[in-house]
């Protein structure tokens, strides 16, 4: 018999110590990785529930196992909330991750060797949009598009590449682009050659849910997202569509299960359901507006301090610092800021002279600091501290001084009060 008082702390102290140290790290470090966020205790309650015990291959009302009457309710809640939140008429909440959601879309609609047009990883795209080191770049013939001299997506280039190469699918979405994407323009280009428009909105899903960023669902044939990042839910994936194409929906469902996955993670789907409900609250809209405002505030400080921001602005939750002119590598910037308890990630910039393991840039995002309660004043102060570190990247006295300021503001704005 299992007893509810069983715990990790007494049974596996080695593991528990690492878990507790991670709690301390999150509380005492400022998190600026654009893809990271803090999920609510309600989501964690769902993920730690007995739903983890239940196998439920299939879909609500059409399972291959018995005993699914209650997990059917859980999954249907998640489906209905996803559709309502994003204005879709189809939702699949089973993908274990954004990458698996993308894989399911490709497998549903493409054959190996088909041509796809996706954003160049070096210009802000994502691994699953055709990077040669990813399955998407190995299975399909990839034609990349990128940004122009101003740092904005070059739609004329997309149109020209589409006309020349006749891809079966055009992919919209990004992992490091700070502008607004014209989804209607991308659909127009896709329609001009009879291609699917597939949008991966993983990074901006929370902003879209709150009306802060344009919604691709009315324009794209298929949309995927993660459920974490700006959406602030559990780690997982989601597929959406609109337009009433039941054959497309059947293909997508079959591609997820049994095509790419077996049993769904019902405890995670419960977490998704909770997060989707939270995303419908007025407080969530206010949070997303603050995320965007904080990013703009940080950009203003970096520009005023003489740092180059790719495209010179941000229209979402993230931006890229280009450190080429400062003769600082992304790797060194990442490490120095880390010593000050400020967590970022090194990131390639357009036409980067350094390798992806070194890079010449840093990606910065504001979802996590905003979740702590930071507003523009704190965001500006933080950006100033980061400039102080980067201006004195080999001065450990300065870095330690900034670290103490970081510890103080983290204590003032705890992640979990």
Swiss-Prot record:
Pfam families: SHMT. The keyword Transmembrane helix does not apply. Disulfide bonds: none annotated. It is found in: Cytoplasm. It comes from Photorhabdus laumondii subsp. laumondii (strain DSM 15139 / CIP 105565 / TT01) (Photorhabdus luminescens subsp. laumondii). GO terms for biological process: glycine biosynthetic process from serine; tetrahydrofolate interconversion. Its EC number is 2.1.2.1. It catalyses: (6R)-5,10-methylene-5,6,7,8-tetrahydrofolate + glycine + H2O = (6S)-5,6,7,8-tetrahydrofolate + L-serine. Belongs to the SHMT family. It comes from the Bacteria. PANTHER family: SERINE HYDROXYMETHYLTRANSFERASE (PTHR11680:SF50). This is Serine hydroxymethyltransferase.
């Amino acid at each position: 018999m299992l007893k509810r008082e069983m715990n990790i702390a007494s049974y596996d102290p080695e593991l528990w110590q690492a878990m507790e140290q991670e709690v301390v790290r999150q509380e005492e470090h400022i998190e600026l990785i654009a893809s990271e966020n803090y999920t609510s205790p309600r989501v964690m309650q769902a993920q730690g529930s007995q739903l983890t015990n239940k196998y439920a291959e299939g879909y609500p009302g059409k399972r291959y196992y018995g005993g699914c009457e209650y997990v059917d309710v859980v999954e249907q809640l998640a489906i209905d909330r996803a559709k309502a939140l994003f204005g879709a008429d189809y939702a699949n909440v089973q993908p274990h991750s954004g990458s698996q959601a993308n894989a399911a879309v490709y497998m549903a609609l493409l054959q190996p060797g088909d041509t796809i047009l996706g954003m160049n990883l070096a210009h802000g795209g994502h691994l699953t949009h055709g990077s040669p080191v990813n399955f998407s770049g190995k299975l399909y013939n990839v034609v990349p598009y990128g940004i122009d001299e101003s740092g904005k997506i070059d739609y004329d280039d997309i149109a020209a590449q589409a006309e020349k190469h006749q891809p079966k699918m055009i992919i919209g979405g990004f992992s490091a682009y700070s502008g607004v994407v014209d989804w209607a323009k991308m659909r127009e280009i896709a329609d001009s050659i009879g291609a699917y428009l597939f949008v991966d909105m993983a990074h901006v899903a929370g902003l879209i849910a709150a009306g802060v960023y344009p919604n691709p669902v009315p324009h794209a044939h298929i949309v995927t997202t993660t459920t974490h990042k700006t959406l602030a839910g559990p780690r997982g994936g989601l597929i959406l569509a609109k337009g009433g194409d039941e054959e497309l929906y059947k293909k997508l469902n079959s591609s997820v299960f049994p095509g790419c996955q077996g049993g769904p993670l019902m405890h995670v789907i419960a977490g998704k359901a909770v997060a989707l409900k939270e995303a419908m609250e007025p407080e969530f809209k206010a949070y997303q507006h603050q995320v965007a405002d904080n990013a703009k505030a940080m950009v203003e400080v970096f520009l005023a301090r003489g740092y180059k921001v790719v495209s010179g602005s941000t229209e979402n939750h993230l931006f890229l610092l280009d450190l080429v002119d400062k003769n600082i590598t992304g790797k060194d910037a990442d490490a120095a800021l880390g010593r000050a308890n400020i967590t970022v990630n090194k990131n390639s910039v357009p036409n980067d002279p350094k390798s992806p393991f070194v890079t010449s840039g840093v990606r910065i995002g504001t979802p996590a600091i905003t979740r702590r309660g930071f507003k523009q004043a704190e965001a500006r102060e933080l950006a100033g501290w980061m400039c102080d570190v980067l201006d004195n990247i080999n001065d450990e006295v300065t870095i330690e001084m900034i670290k103490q300021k970081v510890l103080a503001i983290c204590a003032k704005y705890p992640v979990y009060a």
